[in-house]
């Protein structure tokens, strides 16, 4: 099993690479690519960790050697948020980066499962889809926006509020991956009751958690370490699924188009990527209103991505 991390010299990429070096199944190959010349050094550094995962690093303009033979490609390349920026401000730089990477993937490893971390995910995933469609290699079962960070934040914040073990808390999160499009389904958390005030406050905190970190880092970056953890969880889920295990995770995928052409929802993963898009259950009145209220934003984000490629 070969996993490629694209954008591996960045804050998310290095954290993700460290976690994968420690947690990928024995015999896996880990390829790191970044435009930054430090990347082979990041691989050399990680290669000293005594785990049965081989690692190579590649730098420069061409990601081809890292992508060759990849089963899973995790893309974290791009610029990070700074205070005062929202995820839309990232679009101007990151859209072009994702487009050119998708063009290479279409040629070099068109059958790989692709997990996109680069923000704004609501828009970068449709960009990748349009590029792959143009190349005639698009398989909607194999393209994912990684929204796992919203899930792990929700689990953490609920556990903190209710004094529970975060490893035991499960919170479904649907919609998109920025601001109001992030919708934690707190009504479905088992064994926990929330007041209306708690639901409103928790939902807002989960939606704004990225900004919380950007401001706390005071210009020194965005959420890189927790995102690395989230991306590792999702990447390992893909690896397990490709090896024949049945895994359920939440991801931003092309679904049946009920609400938007791309939507974060629970998916059953298997050897071909998405095996089945699962129902997300009954929504509370608060959640229904939040869902209705976000769709214009989410559909607008998606359209920006489609238009960018056309």
Swiss-Prot record:
Belongs to the LDH/MDH superfamily. MDH type 1 family. Disulfide bonds: none annotated. Catalyzes the reversible oxidation of malate to oxaloacetate. CDD domains: MDH_glyoxysomal_mitochondrial. GO terms for molecular function: L-malate dehydrogenase (NAD+) activity. It is an enzyme of class 1 (oxidoreductase). It comes from the Bacteria. Substrate binds at residues 81, 87, 119, 153. Gene3D superfamilies: Lactate dehydrogenase/glycoside hydrolase, family 4, C-terminal, NAD(P)-binding Rossmann-like Domain. NAD(+) binds at residues 7-13, 34, 94, 117-119, 227. Keywords: NAD, Oxidoreductase, Tricarboxylic acid cycle. One of its GO terms (cellular component) is cytoplasm. PROSITE patterns: MDH (PS00068). It catalyses: (S)-malate + NAD(+) = oxaloacetate + NADH + H(+). The keyword Magnesium does not apply. Homodimer. Its EC number is 1.1.1.37. This is Malate dehydrogenase. The active site is at 177 (proton acceptor). GO terms for biological process: malate metabolic process; tricarboxylic acid cycle. The gene is mdh.
């Amino acid at each position: 099993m070969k996993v490629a991390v694209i954008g591996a010299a960045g804050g998310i990429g290095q954290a993700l690479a460290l976690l994968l070096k420690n947690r990928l199944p024995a015999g896996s190959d880990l390829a790191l690519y970044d435009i930054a010349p430090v990347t082979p050094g990041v691989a050399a550094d990680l290669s000293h960790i005594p785990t049965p995962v081989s690692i190579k690093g590649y730098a420069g303009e061409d990601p081809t050697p890292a992508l060759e033979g990849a089963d899973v490609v995790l893309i974290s390349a791009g610029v990070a948020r700074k205070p005062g920026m929202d995820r839309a401000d990232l679009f101007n730089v990151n859209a072009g980066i994702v487009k050119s990477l998708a063009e290479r993937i279409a040629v070099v490893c068109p059958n790989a499962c692709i997990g996109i971390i680069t923000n704004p995910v609501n828009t970068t995933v449709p960009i990748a889809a349009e590029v792959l469609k143009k190349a005639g290699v698009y398989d909607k079962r194999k393209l994912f926006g990684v929204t796992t960070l919203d899930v792990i934040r929700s689990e953490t914040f609920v556990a903190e509020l209710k004094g529970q073990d975060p490893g035991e808390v499960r919170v479904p999160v649907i919609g998109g991956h920025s601001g109001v499009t992030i919708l934690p389904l707190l009504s479905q958390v088992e064994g926990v009751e929330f007041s209306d005030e708690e639901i409103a406050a928790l939902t807002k905190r989960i939606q704004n958690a990225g900004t919380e970190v950007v401001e706390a880092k005071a210009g020194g970056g965005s959420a890189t370490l927790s995102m690395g953890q989230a991306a590792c969880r999702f990447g390992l889920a893909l690896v397990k699924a490709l090896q024949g295990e049945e895994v359920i995770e939440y991801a931003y995928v092309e679904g049946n188009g009920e609400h938007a052409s791309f939507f974060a929802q629970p998916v059953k993963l298997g050897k071909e990527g998405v095996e089945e898009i699962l129902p997300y259950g009954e929504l509370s009145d608060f959640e229904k209103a939040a869902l209705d209220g976000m769709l214009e934003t989410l559909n607008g984000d998606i359209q920006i991505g489609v238009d960018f490629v056309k």
